[in-house]
């Protein structure tokens, strides 16, 4: 039970005594310590004033040996603690004691004159010191004084004996008050304590002592006079139960709940789990956590249940459960009563109870010497220690079998030493017989000898409500008693009544996480009884037993005895509990573990009923009822998309939590996939609710249509509500699409991690994993999903581990054979050995490329969804100058405060405090920032918040899917100082700066367009020079940057163009399309545009490293304009460039000119262009004469049309649109397809004529 629940319960029942606690304030005064301090100071000032008794005969100060020994034995005990123990001892002595003057043996207990006042004083001490100061000093003082064992238990048992004999008391009312005071102290002193990170240092120091004291209390309560204390406590509540509900007072209900608290505490007390550091050389001994003279058998669950049965405690539970909600207050008593039931069955396997049906119950258990009694059926180990020994022997036998399989048959007792020589002349030495089997065992032996420097710290954050500190062992007698109680509990309708009333209690609460422990107990109890009933149904259906258990009615084949837990209210509660636990930050993993356990049992019931109704040929009416119940369970569970999305996500992260959490996650996925498969085969239709926001336009239209008919009180509020109204609709579940989401690569990794623990798994659990992999690899044919090196290694190790005679070994061999057959074919067809080292990416582009080697073509729907607004990282900021940390936090907190994000700062501080607590326990742990969903967007988009996070030392992500990382190098002290500064300036808002300046005055942009790591691909270019803001508002920055890149590449000259071939010039529409394609390939992030095989070299472009220099202050404007002027003059002198030959020749000479940098060689360029033009004209004339389609005179006149300089520049763009230069199309011809004759097309020849006016 959590610490917060403990404090809440104590506060409820003992607030009435808070006024009396003032009497004890300042009661303990360490006057002696002050006097000693004054004497020491006086002696230091005047050494001669010391008392003669304080020095020995040699003049040296005498040593108080007794005091020194006391301080050495109890170094942590202060003088105030000693005084406190003395006061408690005085109160316990004044309470009473054995009356040795009496002739009765043993002597009866005689109460003191102020016994009631002493009990009240002790209770005030507990509340004033232990509760308020977070300590256990009073509790330990009571244990040392023997208050519980020597006084409270004896007083209650003596009072019960007198009431049983119907003896009269002098003051009956006072005696009842004393008994209630004794019960209150018992509840306080047996209340469960837990060691948590937030526990105080005093609590951590005294934790084990308190636990051992409580174990002594439990043993005394269960064994004193055969558990008469339990009967005495029940006697206190019997008069209240006999009253009518209307006649009971609030005090009566409080007493009933106090009694339930006492029984709950007795069930909850167990030994603390051993916690020895790995660095310690101390051997863990089981008895270290037990007090002297107490064994596990004295406080085991079997002993507790046996004592409860003898003293009618179980009968009290049945009575209260059957009358809850009618005779008893369900809200006041229901949760505590349910917790008692839960503690009775926690850790008990229902199969162990159901196995008793196959054996005859011994009638003479207390007569082991009777040979005629069937004691040969009773297990030989009937004690807790014996059962523990059986488990240990079974584990030892399993380990020995695995070792003998991996050892050679001959010379097994001799040692061996192997030398392995690897690459680079490295040699390794391996010793042991295991290394002689094969190479795999040799390398595995070598791997085990490695010592990893970076140790992984693993914490289990999901077992708070599901796992006890010790394994539960039940002997035969305890199982028989528990079986009888459970059958009576189910047959009498107590379970249905209790669950029905508690469902209404939880559904009426404001938040289901308000009482998280009670909610977890509720669903865990339901899950246990579901499992018990399901196993019993399967047992009777198989016909393995014909015995009729005691107290069982004809409820074998249906679930009527647990029908209340299958109500729609519980399904709604379960879904809400799951969604709330997952949505809150940080996530409640322990609650999600509880949800998965209950969900597993519900799916098991549904699958069992559906399979039985489909395969059974018996009563059709019963089969129809089973089918309806099975479909109803699934339809009520898979009711919302949010819940189904959580089920997709939980298995993806299950490997980060405890083995129990991982196991139940695997079971849920396995059963859910099996259920979906059965429903798909039977064509069962299920519908799920999806929600979407109503569009604002439609909402405004509806508002206008109804404005005349409905009077609007507050128009703005109504408009806002309608705008944000959520529309709920149902859609049919697509089983295939739903199934695909459970084959995510993270889920596959979870299964691989689970299978890697094959030594701890049963054959059935291994088969679950193989079924999953078979469905993914064989049925769905998703081969790349399992082409992973870690999976291959696990399969190899699993095959060597399994015995060759087992059935599961044959299934593993068949799967490995099929897997390697497909893998060899895939690696030969599409070699990608690097990809097997990592899990596959789940995006469609990566999956398509790895499977087929081709790029993914987006559908129209995906293109439309890609155009939806996406959040980009905020513009990076920096401080204008150097500031101290105090000033930095002042600026950033003030900026966020002015933006109205004060609530976000509060949430940030809370999560930083959570991280600070984790860092205090382990500095090397890696954590992530977990803000609320409403504020996660700001971590990406708000530049001020991103700078604040970096100032703290965090690493913000670059997308909504990336978490804000807390690096391991960030210490807890750094986080603590950051929290202090943020809190400081949050409390001083609005802050003032010098000259009344705004916080943003001290910040500036870093100049980067996007706050993300610079990682351009080969298809991206860098800007060689700055550009002015665009004049056309509809033109994107990508268009302008692409044009500048093309111009720069044309001027600089590229060497990819084949000599003698000009670039094809298309019409306006084709150029527009090409322009758009170039835009998508230039500056935008890669979107896996599909290119043909001829376009594979399209992205070989000039990088910006040619233009970027070390200094940003240097400008290349003068060189740029000088080069432009030279190009202009040469074009004017040569008369323009007409064909591909001229262009090619021009490029060559221009390249040499650029290399030499001489202006005088410009004439060479002109002569080269003119000579090539003359040759080209002859070729063109000859080709035109042979052409049938001779152009007209008007076309020839148009051919001499002037061409602008911009067109010439476009010709000079050196950016190939085709991959192979042989496939380039010249300006005068359009090549035909293979096998067809090429049809020449006449192109108009144009010359460039630039007048002097144009030149100016």
Swiss-Prot record:
The keyword Disulfide bond does not apply. Residues 1222-1231 have a biased composition (Low complexity). One of its GO terms (biological process) is DNA repair. It is found in: Nucleus. Residues 26-38, 1194-1204 have a biased composition (Acidic residues). One of its GO terms (cellular component) is replication fork protection complex. Its main location: nucleus. Residues 39-53, 1097-1110, 1179-1190 have a biased composition (Basic and acidic residues). Residues 26-58, 695-725, 1052-1121, 1176-1256 are annotated as: Disordered. It comes from the Eukaryota. Residues 1060-1086 have a biased composition (Basic residues). One of its GO terms (molecular function) is DNA binding. Keywords: Cell cycle, DNA damage, DNA repair, DNA replication inhibitor, Meiosis, Nucleus. Component of the fork protection complex (FPC) consisting of TOF1 and CSM3. PANTHER family: PROTEIN TIMELESS HOMOLOG, TIMEOUT/TIMELESS-2. Forms a fork protection complex (FPC) with CSM3 and which is required for chromosome segregation during meiosis and DNA damage repair. FPC coordinates leading and lagging strand synthesis and moves with the replication fork. FPC stabilizes replication forks in a configuration that is recognized by replication checkpoint sensors. Belongs to the timeless family. This is Topoisomerase 1-associated factor 1.
